[in-house]
Amino acid sequence: IARSNPSTPLSAETGGKNAIILTASGDRDHAIMNVVASAFGNAGQKCSACSLLLVERSVYEDKNFREKLKDAATSMKVGSVWNPGNVVGPMITNGNDKLLKALELEQGESWLVPPQFLDKNKYVLAPTVKWGVRPGSYSFRTELFGPMLSVVCIENLQQGIELVNSLDYGLTSGLQSLDEEEQRLWKNSIMAGNLYINRGITGAIVNRQPFGGMKLSAFGGGVKAGGPNYCACFVKISDKPGSTTDYKQSYPKAYEQEFAH
């Protein structure tokens, strides 16, 4: 649209490669719950879904943590959306070339939970976890839009922040840490539009949490959907001398709801 008519006002949210960082001070069980919900809910087909899990080395090397993450992923109910007990349903397409390429291992990678299609047409992919993903690799940098989580080992929070900020996208991001200093550092340093601490990174609520990002996750004015200036780039605002509006008289119900208390 912008190429055919550059003067056309255009604002868009364009995707994400979203990460959660888990430090040694985080509640591991709580973090696993948040990660699998963010990565595999809606079969990973949300622009806000968690695609990367960056784990501090002491946690990354903990066999108990690995087994709990594996168990959480494999315990999710997968199948038809007509079965209300299923949490992970089919993908919108079986021709997602980016995802299919990511289902191949690169150097140093292994499967914590290997890919498994549950139907012959390959629309239903069970939650998949790739272990040992390296910064800069295909799975690290590419938005996959499917139920696959890539786990990366980091030395500390600062390195994790730098790796997340090196991504081309900046939509949602999460931190699992109980350390207030780590939370402060992360909030002041991370480059993403919607930030979440010790909770999942999907599910922004309309009219409560404006949603949008930066870098390749946004195009246009950079304002968030649901925010007060979302449509500002499509209108011209000007003052007319001598023209005022008595909002209390013109919009009595709205005025009362807003200012009565």
What are these regions (language model features)?
Residues I1-R134, Q158, I197, S243-H261:
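ALDH superfamily catalytic-core signature
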